[in-house]
């Protein structure tokens, strides 16, 4: 992977990202806004899946998910910008790999939800309790996103990356 990181860091795009002093801070702001959307909305939905806020129909909680997806796309774009700008600081950082693991876990968990219990769970109305499988999916999702947040915040402190 270090060969790939060295190649990526030698590209014109990488040099542009680090050459202009406004790019990195702008991406940090956008990344934070995107993360706020993802954690806030996905966290709300996850808590509903876990059995909290039963007055809210599950489908109504899910209606906000397009905003969370927008936030995720903001994070994907800015995260890729960070990676292209300084790939060596990421590939050698345990916190980055832990963050990637949590992202993959969150994605797999969402796929499991959508392909197994999603349709049945969306039909639950106000006052209905969610099945145990939905509670587990919600807990794994919430833990995954909090892991993404935690490990992302640890990036500067683990491995002296920044």
Predicted regions span which residues?
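Polytopic transmembrane helical bundles with strong interfacial aromatic enrichment
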Residues: 1-162
